[in-house]
Amino acid sequence: MQENLLEKQFLNHPLYTKIQELKALNLTCNFSLDDSVNLSTNSQAKDEILAITKELKPWRKGPFKIDDLFIDTEWQSFIKFNILKPFMNEISQKCVADIGCNNGYYMFKMLEFNPAKLIGFDPSIKYRLQFELINALAKTPIKYELLGVEDLPSYSLKFDVIFCLGVIYHRSDPVKMLKDLKAGLNKNGVVFLDTMYIEDEREIALVPNKTYSKIPNIYFVPSISALKNWCERAGFKEFEVLATKKTDENEQRKTEWIDSFSLENFLDPKDKNLTIEGYEAPKRVYIRIKI
């Protein structure tokens, strides 16, 4: 029911109509990948493309380059992607899902590794519209569902590999979320997940009061030991830490494409090791878990 409502709102959105008009031009596009997702069209529709991209702000994940238009997104998402890149051979010829896929940046980057099928899940009309704009030019076979992680158990496909990046701390029941991920896997499936974490040897989690780094919907920020316990309780048998990284102002910063504050405004101005609320500053752990 929720999917149908979102899909209806999406299809009736005025920007969807504009993107469809752009798609109808059937522009020739050269699609390439480096740190950016690059689209070269040499088209006469540059003004229309610029207008749509401006209406679709904020752009969080990226960057993207469309001809001479550079969408300098809040996050330099290639930094996260490059942490996971050594493991991307695992998606070759596999059925892959990206949960919380935002505008699809990571999925576009994954195409280089030849997945058999690539499906993104995110119940956000704005991010879906951003994806549709990019894909109207790139013309990739990526599929985007206006669904959340809770829809995985009943989804029509199971997946060999699931990416779930920057989602679990937004969930009020992280073990339930992990169970939903597990239910979406094929036999011998694998999940790549990242989360903010706290430095502590104990099996505990930070429960922020109201906000964490000025973000209101952060429920739990676990220690790595607590995260491991969550995964075991959800039924995962293998837990491997791939990397840890502190979030810095090179990776996340304010640009003209977000019209709001960013990391520099979320940290204690006197001590960048603390958030504005006095918690540990954000850092992330990347894990691989298997059933």
From Swiss-Prot:
InterPro entries: CmoB, Mo5U34_MeTrfas-like, SAM-dependent_MTases_sf. It is an enzyme of class 2 (transferase). CDD domains: AdoMet_MTases. Keywords: Transferase, tRNA processing. It catalyses: carboxy-S-adenosyl-L-methionine + 5-hydroxyuridine(34) in tRNA = 5-carboxymethoxyuridine(34) in tRNA + S-adenosyl-L-homocysteine + H(+). SUPFAM superfamilies: S-adenosyl-L-methionine-dependent methyltransferases. Gene3D superfamilies: Vaccinia Virus protein VP39. Its EC number is 2.5.1.-. GO terms for molecular function: transferase activity, transferring alkyl or aryl (other than methyl) groups. Carboxy-S-adenosyl-L-methionine binds at K61, W75, K80, G100, D122, P123, S124, V149, E150, Y169, R284. Catalyzes carboxymethyl transfer from carboxy-S-adenosyl-L-methionine (Cx-SAM) to 5-hydroxyuridine (ho5U) to form 5-carboxymethoxyuridine (cmo5U) at position 34 in tRNAs. HAMAP family: tRNA_carboxymethyltr_CmoB. Homotetramer. This is tRNA U34 carboxymethyltransferase. The gene is cmoB.
